[in-house]
Amino acid sequence: MYQEEIVIYARTRCRQCRRARRILKRRGYAFEAVDVGGDEELSARLVETTGKKEVPLIFLGGRLVGGLADIEALERSGDLDRLVRGRV
């Protein structure tokens, strides 16, 4: 798996994934987008390490932040900026 500061594991045609990417872009965060569509090995490793089968999965500094609902909640509360600023 990638070790960029912010990494989003997603699928190209996933509506929730597009929403999560838009949030990160709107906040001005640089991130690495990794398409897991068709990569069964990577998908299996993500499930093994996170226990989650759905995407998007957003990592910050190699640690799982969560999925779309988590990013939306962090953005609403203002904690997303604090979390990212503490890492970047």
Located regions from the model:
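Positively charged, proline/Ser/Thr-rich regional signature most characteristic
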Residues: R19, R27, D35-E40, D70
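Loop/helix-junction capping segments adjacent to catalytic residues or to phosphate/diphosphate-binding pockets
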Residues: C14-C17, E40, V65, L74
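Short, glycine/charged-enriched secondary-structure capping and boundary segments
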Residues: R21-L24, E48, I71-L74
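Thioredoxin-like thiol-disulfide oxidoreductase module
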Residues: D35-K53, D79-R87
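Structural alpha/beta surface segment adjacent to cysteine/selenocysteine redox centers
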Residues: R27-A30, S43-V55, F59-V65
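Local sequence-structure signature of Cys/Sec-based thiol-disulfide redox active-site neighborhoods
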Residues: M1-A30
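Non-catalytic, surface beta->alpha helical segment in thiol-disulfide oxidoreductase systems
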Residues: L60-V88
